[in-house]
A protein has these predicted regions:
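Beta-hairpin "wing" of winged helix-turn-helix
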Residues: 54-62, 66-67
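N-terminal helix-turn-helix DNA-binding core of bacterial DNA-binding proteins
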Residues: 5, 9-11, 15-37, 56
Length: 144
């Protein structure tokens, strides 16, 4: 499994909004400058996030985007699944409703299941609030 640029940038975009969660809208242009990602590409990503109800769009001269909820209410897993779809490494562990006909006799199923559980466990345990805190700690520790 490889996370696409879209998924990585969606997490960065949401983190940027969380870092600038002051009650005022943040423009795509400002996010683009800070993240080094084209505003056109960010507009495509923010559209997906907006349709899913993750962000609120504010129109007008002082317009931009804001998180709809508190940063602690978004996990990295939520953002990645929205932009990437399933994070399962193989199809046989992709859906709980799907029963693999070889599951009982397939030793490798155990590997894929453990890998899937590990991936989901990690991305579902990290919130935007966690990332904000980590980013602030990294910034505090950065000394020239």
């Amino acid at each position: 499994m490889k996370i696409s640029t879209k998924g990585r940038y969606a997490v960065r975009l949401m983190l940027d909004l969380a870092m600038h969660n002051t009650g005022e809208a943040v423009s795509i242009k400002d996010i683009s400058k800070r993240q080094g990602v084209s505003d056109k590409y960010l507009e495509q990503i923010i559209s997906v996030l907006n349709k899913a109800g993750y962000v609120r769009s504010i129109r007008g001269a002082q317009g931009g985007y804001m998180l709809k909820k508190d940063p602690k209410d978004y996990t990295v897993g939520m953002i990645l699944r929205l932009t990437e779809g399933s994070l399962a490494p193989v199809a046989c562990v992709d859906d709980d409703d799907m029963v693999c006909e070889r599951e009982n006799g397939c030793v490798t199923f155990y590997v894929w299941k453990k890998l899937n559980d590990a991936i989901n466990g990690v991305v579902d345990s990290i919130t935007l609030a966690d990332l904000v805190e980590m980013q602030m700690q990294m910034s505090d520790n950065y000394v020239i």
